[in-house]
Each structure stands twice: as C-alpha cells, then as structure tokens.
Amino acid sequence: MKVRAVIKLVEEDGWFLDRTRGSHKQYKHHFKRGLVTISGNLDYEVPRGTLNSILKQSGHKEILER
C-alpha cells in the first residue's frame, strides 16, 4: 500500500493533519486519543510492519485481519 492510500484511509476516518516535520506527518482526531505518524514520500510503498503500526494507531484493526 502506498503512503498516499494510507493517508486517504486515515483522513476518511476523521484524522486531520496536525503537524509536519520533514517527511513525517502527524495526524490527530477530535475524539480518538493519540497521534498517527505517517512518514515517507507519497509514492513510497509502506512496509508491512509499518502499515500494521499505523493501522493500530488509527484504530483500523479490522483491516489487519484481512
């Protein structure tokens, strides 16, 4: 999955961009706790372990089971 697709998934769930430093983007949610950090160029492929971590942070556990 590309970084662009991960960002789209997170934003559709209500997360919004809070801050950026270099290639790292941190997203916040109005109701959910914590931050979701996504790094890399938009066209980069996200490694499987990193993708699992991002999905756990954002609360998308159902996607992990697929």
Can you say where each PLM-predicted feature lies in the sequence?
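Active-site beta-strand termini and strand-to-loop segments that position acidic
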Residues: 27-31
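Generic signal for short, ordered secondary-structure residues
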Residues: 10, 33-34
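Conserved beta-strand positions that form and line the central face of beta-propeller blades
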Residues: 26, 37
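C-terminal structural segments of small proteins and small subunits
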Residues: 34-35, 41-66
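Short secondary-structure junctions
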Residues: 14-19, 62
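Amphipathic alpha-helical segments
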Residues: 2-14
